[in-house]
Amino acid sequence: MTSLVYFSSASENTHRFVQKLGVPATRIPLHDRAGTFEVDEPYVLILPTYGGGITATGRDTSYVPKQVIRFLNNTHNRSLIRGVIAAGNTNFGESYCYAGNVISQKCRVPYLYRFELMGTAEDVVAVLDGLEQFMESEQWHRQSQTQPRLGV
């Protein structure tokens, strides 16, 4: 099975979804202010979407948790991302799972799937099947590209 890296806030919704997958996964620490957490193999990132909104500078990065931004601003970590899966809440309308769009565009990787809150049994099956197919694809084996920093 593919390598998964995920972030889950204190609500643990994303963590519970990853547990349901039943595959090894590495969690981005909730408190890693130094930004020293690194991975050593290609991975698919699973992350929740935060509320979002336009910042004073006009940049819209608040959908992505700050811990994930720090993790991906590490050039080594960013070079190993191969795809993204996002969690969200449909109550947020157009912002539903928007963190996946941001990461996909900024890191130039496919947006593989989105699910609500902790996901359903159908989401688990879809993600496991999709990851298996993705691992066999050319995109999984691609060389890293030069990618811009996410910004804060």
Swiss-Prot record:
<comment type="similarity">
    <text>Belongs to the NrdI family.</text>
</comment>
<dbReference type="InterPro" id="IPR020852">
    <property type="entry name" value="RNR_Ib_NrdI_bac"/>
</dbReference>
<dbReference type="Pfam" id="PF07972">
    <property type="entry name" value="Flavodoxin_NdrI"/>
</dbReference>
<comment type="function">
    <text>Probably involved in ribonucleotide reductase function.</text>
</comment>
<dbReference type="GO" id="GO:0036211">
    <property type="term" value="P:protein modification process"/>
</dbReference>
<protein>
    <recommendedName>
        <fullName>Protein NrdI</fullName>
    </recommendedName>
</protein>
<dbReference type="InterPro" id="IPR004465">
    <property type="entry name" value="RNR_NrdI"/>
</dbReference>
<dbReference type="GO" id="GO:0010181">
    <property type="term" value="F:FMN binding"/>
</dbReference>
<dbReference type="InterPro" id="IPR029039">
    <property type="entry name" value="Flavoprotein-like_sf"/>
</dbReference>
